[in-house]
Amino acid sequence: KEIFENPRTLKVAEISNDPPMNILQANIDSNKIKFEGIDVDVPNHLNNVKDKNFNLGIRASNIELSDNGFEFEVELAEISGSETLLHLKRGNSKIITSIEEVMNFNINDKVKINFDIDKVYAFNENGILASSPFGGSYV
C-alpha cells in the first residue's frame, strides 16, 4: 500500500501502476501548474513543492473524458477486456487513460479529458517524490 500511495521514485511510480503512471514535465507559476498550454490551480498538497520545474504524475484511472476538458489527440485505442486504454498526446506530452467501457476511437481523433488535480503527484527533476496526495515526500 505504501509503495502505491507514496512511490519513492518515478521508476517505482511507473512500474507499480498498470498502465504506468503518466509523467508530464510541468512547472508551477503564479499558483498554477502549467504544462502543454494547460493551466490548473495548484492543489493544497503541492503547495510546498520547492522546485518550480517538476514531473507531474497522474494515474490513468484519474483521467476521464469530459466535454469541458483539455483537448488531446488519440494515438492508439486498445480494447482490453471490458475497458479501453486510450493513448493520447498533446504537444510533446503523451498520456494513457483507462475508460471502463469498450469504446471505438480512430487515430488522430480529438478528445477532451479532465483529471482529478487532488490526486496528482510531484516528482523533482531527479525523479524523487516531492509530494503525493497521501502526504508522502522523500525530499
Features from the language model and the residues they span:
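Short acidic-hydrophobic catalytic motif
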Residues: 1-5, 13
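Non-catalytic connector elements of ABC transporters
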Residues: 19-23, 28-139
